Amino acid sequence: MPAATTSIFYLPDINIAPWLESPTSPSGQQVVDQVRKACTSTGFFQLTGHGLSQDVVEDIFAASAKFFALPKDVKQGLNFTKNLGFRGYELIGAQVYESDVLPDLKEGFLAGIDLPFEDMRVQNKRFFAGQNVWPPPDVLPYAEFREPVEKYYKSIMQLCFTVMDLVAATLPYGPDVFDEWKSHEPACPLRLLHYPPTPAHVAGKTRQLGSSAHTDFGALTLLLQDSHEGLEVLNHDTGDWVLVPPKPGAFVVNIADMMTMVTVGEYKSSKHRVINRNETEDRYSVVFFMDGNVDYKLRRLDKIGQPIGDDEDLLTVEDYMLGKRNSTYVK
């Protein structure tokens, strides 16, 4: 592995346009250096210059707001725990990451790659393998929800693969080091999230958060925030929570647990949380998780084929993700 970088709290804004235009140019290499520094410190950065249409971004936020405004019974009819592949509506309080706090004050909607029912991954109930579910079109027309979600999913998948290639460029293992991880219609959940206004008597307390403190489980995450603050990253050196301010058109990118595993801790997966401190307004975010090819084996990048830790057999993406999912959702 490359030599470890001294840990500092570094959460930069990075314009990747120079790298997209000319990866080997001095300005392109400067982007690579910035991303590497972010990956080895907090694992977080704000990404701009990505080229994803602002119309697509605005449409996904509008679609999300319309969905979460639906009657409770309509949303509960799409309960993700009753659908193959964990697709559909996630109830408020369905998840909690910490043992000493109340379940999270958020609701969600999950979608992904649509696989036909006959696909053996669906039949065998593999991780996140299934078909998307949608509100009835007479309740929420496809043009107002399904189509914007599907369009956004296609766009964000392409951007995610670009970011994976950029992260690969920060490592000494070649540009194709993550190709297998990205292959075979990877498990990449798209999660629309709604954080209701937080009552004044709750906003200053930590017993119930919008999203309790956690690290993400996959390879990396791409997050869109609306204009409302809420996302905070833990500074491990000081114990302080640092606000990640919303920036129009920017994606928050963060390294997740499996990337930390394969880089043997060099690339950091930092704890973060969400508190909607607004007492009157809703907060929305759109999260894309790059979990990857469910059969991909989580091997050290510098020692291909050797197990991580003391395991006799290498964990797969599916092994790791199922364990994490089962431990964070309220039974």
Swiss-Prot record:
Positions with a binding annotation for 2-oxoglutarate: 283
Keywords of this entry: Dioxygenase, Iron, Metal-binding, Oxidoreductase, Virulence
One Pfam family in the UniProt entry: DIOX_N
Alphabetized GO MF terms: dioxygenase activity; metal ion binding
Cofactor(s) in the UniProt record: Fe(2+)
Binding site for Fe cation: 214, 216, 272
Enzyme class: oxidoreductase
Metabolic or biological pathway: Mycotoxin biosynthesis
InterPro entries per record: DIOX_N, IPNS-like_FE2OG_OXY, IPNS-like_sf, Iron_ascorbate_oxido_reductase, Oxoglu/Fe-dep_dioxygenase_dom
SUPFAM superfamilies, alphabetized: Clavaminate synthase-like
Family label: Belongs to the iron/ascorbate-dependent oxidoreductase family.
Function: 2-oxoglutarate-dependent dioxygenase; part of the gene cluster that mediates the biosynthesis of the selective antifungal agent ascochitine, an o-quinone methide that plays a possible protective role against other microbial competitors in nature and is considered to be important for pathogenicity of legume-associated Didymella species. The pathway probably begins with the synthesis of a keto-aldehyde intermediate by the ascochitine non-reducing polyketide synthase pksAC from successive condensations of 4 malonyl-CoA units, presumably with a simple acetyl-CoA starter unit.
Protein name (record): 2-oxoglutarate-dependent dioxygenase
Species for this entry: Didymella fabae
